[in-house]
């Protein structure tokens, strides 16, 4: 558990700069590509989507533009604050909660889709996070993960 607190402290320290990078990325080809991926993958209208490890809120802005009901979680309180600010500025209605991806506080089968980007490499127990993602995913739901250690 100590390791996850160190990770939280690291991302709390980097939240402001990371948030600025996300703001710029939303304007790039990357944002357009992700919108295309989500449009072609999450085909249910008004799907309930969990962004597991939202960071500064890149995915939820795109998903809300597509009409989905989005819940965004992150363990870093500074990241969730940056994400909430971004959603307000974008006019995106997103529920934001601080939460550990390895111990999701949602009922089984709560979401039509779960998305996650660059989160799993940060975790003490990525397998637990995978199990949790599957647990909260409804039957026939979509799981979209993009991950890699970029540092």
Short names for language-model regions:
Residues 127-139:
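A short glycine-rich, Lys/Arg-flanked "PGG" loop and its adjoining helix->strand segment in the class I
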Residues 113-125:
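A short SAM/SAH-binding and catalytic strip from SAM-dependent methyltransferases
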Residues 70, 143-144:
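A short hydrophobic/small-residue beta-strand
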Residues 102-113:
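A short acidic, Gly/Pro-enriched loop at the edge of an enzyme's catalytic core
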Residues 78, 123-128:
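Short N-terminal helix/helix-N-cap motif within the alpha/beta-hydrolase-1
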């Amino acid at each position: 558990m100590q390791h996850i607190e160190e990770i939280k402290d690291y991302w709390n320290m980097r939240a402001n700069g990371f948030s600025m990078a996300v703001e710029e990325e939303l304007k790039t080809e990357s944002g357009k590509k992700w919108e295309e991926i989500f449009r072609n993958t999450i085909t249910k209208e008004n799907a309930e989507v969990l962004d597991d490890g939202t960071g500064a809120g890149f995915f939820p802005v795109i998903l809300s533009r597509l009409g989905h009901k989005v819940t965004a979680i992150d363990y870093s309180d500074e990241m969730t604050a940056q994400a909430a600010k971004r959603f307000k500025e974008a006019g995106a209605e997103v529920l934001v909660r601080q939460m550990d991806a390895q111990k999701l506080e949602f009922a089984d089968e709560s979401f039509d889709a779960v998305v996650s980007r660059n989160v799993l490499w940060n975790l003490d127990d990525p397998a637990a996070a995978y199990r949790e993602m599957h647990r909260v995913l409804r039957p026939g739901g979509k799981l979209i993960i993009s991950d890699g250690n970029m540092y």
